[in-house]
Structures are given as structure tokens and as C-alpha cells.
């Protein structure tokens, strides 16, 4: 059954098959491509002025880069990260060395700022494409993925609610990987 027959229509768009450029077994690229481009029609987002600099090729390229980084730098230490928790000695936190290497590759890729505007140092990547990228990292190593994902979430809060002074101070360093971020929430009714 072809994608076209599953949709009940003929698709004459040229197709740059995502599964050809992704050499990862973390996520079924054929299914991901079907969801992104046939079900959710993510390519139509490029018709909006905010995303007009992108096309399917750039979307596929960012996803393929994510798959490669996840496969090469996150997946190999998945079990090791689970069995070697971060240690706090009262002054600093120590993780296994592979976490730092994975962090460096993730931050150098630009993915920490991917969903943000160009003016803020981002790629203006649509949320659906960024989520597809994130899925590779979560599949490869949920433990280590927490570091960039919490940083990205903290940066989103700063970008949405902080003063311009704080944005200028923290966002560039978070986006290029010099700073990391977290969210600490308390639940007073359960003893935290």
C-alpha cells in the first residue's frame, strides 16, 4: 500500500524520501515521513511568512542531523547513564563523560534554539519539525535528553516572561550550550 493509496488521493509532489537519508533504527522514518507530510502536512507551513525560508529539504536535513547525533552520541551510553546517576559532592555535579560529549554535539547543532526566531539566534523551526527531532533523542537516551530539553524549556520561559536584560544575559549562553537550565517545581502538599 502506498502513501497515496492510504490517503485515497494521488500525490504528485516530488518526494525526498526521509528514510533514505536517515540511518537510524530509533524511529521508523517511513512512518515519521507519512505523519509529518501526509497526515499533518507540515510542508504547508512554509507558505506562512514566518517559515518561508524553509522547505521540505531543510526540514528533512534537520531531522536527519538529529537522528545522526542521537544515534552516534546519545544511544551508545543509554544504559551507562541509567546505571551511573549524576553525583553531587556538595559543590558540583559529576556525570559520566559521555553526557558532556552528547551535550556538546547537541548544542553545536543549533537545536537548543531551533524553535526560536532568527533575531533571537534560532532557526524559526516549526514546532512539529522540532518535535520530530526531539523524538530521536528521547528514543536514544531519555536520561541524557533531559539536559538539553530542560534547558530549552527554561529558555522558552525566559524568552516569554523575562526582562530584556535577562534575555540578553541568559538566552545566548543557553542557546549555544555555555549555560544549561532546569525547572524546579515544588509540590508542598506532598512534602517537597
How does the language model describe each region?
Residues 13-146, 165, 169, 180:
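Amphipathic, small/basic residue-rich leader segments at the start of a protein or domain
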Residues 114-118, 151, 184-189:
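Cysteine-centered functional microenvironments
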Residues 121, 157-158:
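Residues marking the start of alpha-helices
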Residues 131-135, 152-157, 183:
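Contiguous, well-ordered alpha-helical segments that form the cores/surfaces of helical PPI scaffolds
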Residues 155, 161-192:
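Phosphate/diphosphate-binding loops
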Amino acid at each position: 500500500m502506498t502513501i497515496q493509496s492510504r490517503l485515497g488521493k494521488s500525490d504528485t509532489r516530488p518526494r525526498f524520501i526521509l528514510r533514505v537519508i536517515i540511518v537510524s533504527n530509533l524511529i521508523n522514518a517511513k512512518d515519521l515521513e507519512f505523519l509529518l507530510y501526509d497526515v499533518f502536512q507540515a510542508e504547508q507551513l512554509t507558505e506562512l511568512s514566518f517559515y518561508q525560508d524553509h522547505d521540505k529539504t531543510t526540514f528533512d536535513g534537520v531531522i536527519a542531523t538529529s537522528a545522526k547525533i542521537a544515534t552516534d552520541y546519545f544511544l551508545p551510553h543509554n544504559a551507562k547513564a541509567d546505571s551511573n546517576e549524576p553525583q553531587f559532592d556538595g559543590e558540583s555535579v559529576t556525570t559520566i563523560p559521555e553526557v558532556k560529549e552528547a551535550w556538546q554535539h547537541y548544542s553545536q547543532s543549533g537545536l537548543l534554539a531551533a524553535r526560536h526566531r532568527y533575531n533571537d539566534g534560532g532557526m524559526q523551526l516549526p514546532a512539529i519539525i522540532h518535535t520530530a527531532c526531539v523524538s530521536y533523542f528521547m528514543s536514544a537516551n531519555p536520561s541524557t535528553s533531559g539536559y538539553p530539553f530542560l534547558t530549552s524549556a527554561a529558555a522558552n520561559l525566559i524568552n516569554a516572561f523575562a526582562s530584556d536584560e535577562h534575555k540578553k544575559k541568559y538566552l545566548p549562553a543557553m542557546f549555544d550550550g555555555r549555560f544549561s537550565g532546569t525547572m524546579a517545581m515544588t509540590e508542598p502538599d506532598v512534602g517537597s
